[in-house]
Amino acid sequence: MSLAAYCVICCRRIGSFAPRSKSRTPWRNIRNIIRFTGSLIVGGSLFITYEVLALKKSLMLDTQVVEREKMKSYIYVHKAPVDRLDNRGIVWQARKELHRAVRKLLAAAAKVLRSPFADSFSTVDIEDHDCAVWLLLRKSREDDLAARLQAVREMSEAHHWHDYQYRIIAQACDPRTLIGLARSKESDLRFFLPPPPLPSLKEDSSTEEELRHLLASLPQTELDECLQYFTSLALSESSQSLAAQKGGLWCFGGNGLPYAESFGKVPSATVEMFCLEAIVKHSEIPSHCDHIEAGGGLQLLQRLYQLHKDCPKVQRNVMRIIGNMALNEHLHPAIVHSGWVSLMAEALKSSHIMEASHAARTLANLDRETVGEKYQDGVYVLHPQCRTSQPIKADVLFIHGLMGAAFKTWRQHDSQRALTESAVVDEDRYTTCWPKTWLAKDCPSLRIISVEYDTSLSDWRARCPMERKSIAFRSNELLSKLRAAGVGDRPMIWISHSMGGLLVKKMLLEASKKPELNALINNTRGIIFYSVPHHGSRLAEYSVNIRYLLFPSLEVKELSKDSPALKTLQDDFLEFAKDKNFQVLNFVETQPTFIGSMIKLHVVPVESADLGIGDLIPVDVNHLNICKPKTKDAFLYQRTLQFICETLARDLEN
């Protein structure tokens, strides 16, 4: 700059000189002009070149910075000296609170003005981020439970950290903190490291063979008939064993007929499903869970889970096994170290209610910090599925009926699905589980539980032909599972469909005989029956008429009008309910139901659905749709919601 200024001054001087006499030579002036002009051009060129290079340097991105950031994201080198941070004074605390208040104010202003909240305001903090991260980690290891929960809550609310700070937490936190983050609704998935690499399969092996090997290694003695059936079915339905059986009537000279061979081939996926169903049954036995873990089952199941992302049934069975294993607290370290918490945290955020509910059950069984109950196989919490500060004041239990399930029985009416197929599906317009979507929003202080058990109309369609479970047997089995889940400790309402209502009645009668279950009786505030055959079902009558063709199951036989067990159950329940202070609401269908493609039957007539206690409301639907409201504003849902709110009004206020 000084050189350019000097050139300008010289030019001005030349321009201000008076004309010289003709006696002096003009060449000297020309030489001076050329000298000054050259200096000006050279100096200006150097200045412009310098500015261009400086600007280019400032605009270039140093890729080494990105590489260093990547390394820091996965590996932390040293631990921050948190001891000295405890001595920070009130000035630091004041600055921290002031900055937090300003950040919240900016976020609120951005929301009001509908403009994006600049990341620079959220990532730039007065305090040292790394020190804050290590302070939270230290707080999460304190002996005080409240302090640990507060630390996890603060971690889950952090959404503007750098990637490496989430990785520091992921690598340095203890298992209970990791589980707490997985059960926190707002947790960032960057808190969870990918599962460790799976061991390679043995040479010339497959997942099918590994599954069969794991199943064969489990104890085969002292098993009930159904578990023996599932195990033998899975071990026999292998491609190798069927290939060895291709002889016989369809084989001549050792060469099987081509079409006969096609009959014997079982797809690998089918064999895997047989094995998984057998392992599910084994995982209900605590001692067998130890054998599954020792045999590398956690890694093998994870391989199946990753391979069958497009098969929800496989994934649900895998999660059922992990959820059953999580009931055993001594297996928690193995489950955490194998990477299942990361997978469950991701599944919990799924938009598919069934997948999220299976993950919620597994994580709840792992979380011993905030959950005292244990959710056994077939018991699913629909709400709340995450840690919450909302106090839970009452329970609502959903019990399905014949051929039902914990989720599909309580879906919205199928006619509404077609209306939303071409549009973006809004959960308020269609839901696959209205207790989870609608009731949880309308009554957030309720714990909503749905249970599942196997049923069949015919022994031909039974999953286990040897299974002969009466209503009395199933009610005792369900009652034991519900007590393990803490049912009876709070005020509660039972909601049942079809045979599920008979199970509710039997469970209450059984509980009344046991002094330790008095709390369950006293806390029962109400029961809703959706088309429950208190006096028998016409389905049972029809099944008896064609019993040699249909082979009705034991459950169906017990629903006949002349069933002594059904009449005794009705009489005993009416006697039991005389001095009990709970409300009853009965719904009943008025339309017949198609059973198969040819049979049309009024499954539960009005006279059979009349318990003799409470209101009886006929609804113009069939037996399957009596518990499936068309919309959130439909009479079925609104009347159910009204009953719940009125029955639990005093408990919800408290």
UniProtKB/Swiss-Prot annotation:
Family: Belongs to the SERAC1 family.
Keywords (A to Z) from UniProt: Endoplasmic reticulum, Lipid biosynthesis, Lipid metabolism, Membrane, Mitochondrion, Phospholipid biosynthesis, Phospholipid metabolism, Transmembrane, Transmembrane helix
Keyword Transmembrane: yes
GO BP annotations, alphabetical order: extracellular matrix organization; intracellular cholesterol transport; phosphatidylglycerol acyl-chain remodeling; phospholipid biosynthetic process
Keyword flag Chloroplast: no
Cellular component aspect of the GO annotation: endoplasmic reticulum membrane; extracellular matrix; mitochondria-associated endoplasmic reticulum membrane contact site; mitochondrial outer membrane
PANTHER family registered for this protein in UniProt: PROTEIN SERAC1
Coiled coil spans: none
Transmembrane regions listed in the UniProt entry: 32-54
Protein name (record): Protein SERAC1
Tissue specificity: Testis. Higher expression at both mRNA and protein levels in brain and skeletal muscles, than in other organs.
Chief localization: mitochondrion
Protein function: Facilitates the transport of serine from the cytosol to the mitochondria by interacting with and stabilizing Sideroflexin-1 (SFXN1), a mitochondrial serine transporter, playing a fundamental role in the one-carbon cycle responsible for the synthesis of nucleotides needed for mitochondrial DNA replication. Plays an important role in the phosphatidylglycerol (PG) remodeling that is essential for both mitochondrial function and intracellular cholesterol trafficking.
Effect of Q64T: In strain: BALB/cByJ and C57BL/6J; requires 2 nucleotide substitutions
Lipid bilayer topology: Single-pass membrane protein
Localization terms from the record: Mitochondrion membrane; Endoplasmic reticulum; Mitochondrion
